[in-house]
Amino acid sequence: MSALLRAEGVGKSYTLRGRRVDVLCGVDLAVRGGEVTALVGHSGSGKTTLLHIIGLLTPPDSGRVFVEGTDGTGPVDTSELSDGALADLRRSRLGFVFQSYNLLPQHSALRNVVLPFLGRRGEGEARARALLGRVGLAERADHLPSELSGGEQQRVALARALVNDPPVVLADEPTGNLDTESEEVLLGLFRELADEGRAVLLVTHNPAVSDAADVVHRLDKGAFTSPAEGVPAENAAERVETESAE
């Protein structure tokens, strides 16, 4: 399938103690519908920075990010958008899952999923309940985050990411706080999303996560060491295991 999200020549640098540090150096990345793509590399390699840029959370210093428009209208060059249009595109086309869940502690699981809904008033709760059912939490909808396990909280976060039916799901270390059983459940859900035609991008240190991907890209010192199109997960798993042990 075609790329639903694409970075071209993306560069990013920061100033640290008076010195310029290049975090990303002209990176190209295509995240395709129907695939789970893993982005791997050691700490400081630029993985999360790239996720934030391609997720329209942080602007690049150079290069461009393209997001597939609605109804097959073709890729949108996000560098040409106003801040408001950029925010609208991000909310409607991209869904985010983070390691720390980022759930509001004073609200129920259901309310956490409903809050970002962009549709008609009155439709949000039904949509949220359906998504909680999909992730196996229909009976936990009225529970507070503190009453849920880590794995359950992450599934609430995934349901929230899907509430506006985005074609792209981005996840930063989504299994970092989970036990093996919860990890397997979450990875199964990501696979289902890709099988529906969505594009799924996972940033990870975890060999089990990269092994579950279709394509793996490896970052090192701000550049890809793998081919531009990535490599099949089975060819990359051994390298990820080595990195995790370092």
Give the role of each language-model region.
Residues 55:
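Helix-to-loop junction immediately C-terminal to a conserved catalytic motif
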Residues 16-21, 73-95, 195:
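ABC ATPase NBD coupling module
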